[in-house]
């Protein structure tokens, strides 16, 4: 069985040293230990924090360049933009339909997001 790694960065701004040290560099080093590596630009995730399409598009370019400048070899790794793969949204819809709210309540990312916005406690989950 092939060993695979998957990671991505949300495209919400200009890449910085924290992105490089905390995500890009470790992911590229770790990829050497795997048969296949998948790196993606999480532009759908960015919509949660920024509704300006132009800013997100610029961030996608900046972060893609940061990955490539840091040594990502697009001939050896799969490198893609989240919005270019429609099956991601389809799978997300299916998972949303079968995932219990209790599981989300235990998620650190979900708890942090809801703590920041008490006026919309579940971030639009129940609409």
What are these regions (language model features)?
Residues 1-127:
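NTP-dependent nucleotidyl-transfer catalytic core
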């Amino acid at each position: 069985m092939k060993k695979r790694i998957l990671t991505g960065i949300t495209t919400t701004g200009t890449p910085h040293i924290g992105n490089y040290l905390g995500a890009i560099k470790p992911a590229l080093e770790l990829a050497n230990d795997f048969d296949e590596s998948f790196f993606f630009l999480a532009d759908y995730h960015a919509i949660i924090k920024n509704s300006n399409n132009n800013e997100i598009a610029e961030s996608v370019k900046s972060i893609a360049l940061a990955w490539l400048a840091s040594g990502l070899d697009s001939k050896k790794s799969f490198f893609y933009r989240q919005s270019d793969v429609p099956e991601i949204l389809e799978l997300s819809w299916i998972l949303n339909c079968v995932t219990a709210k209790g599981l989300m309540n235990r998620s650190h990312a979900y708890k942090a997001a809801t703590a920041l916005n008490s006026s919309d406690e579940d971030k639009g989950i129940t609409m």
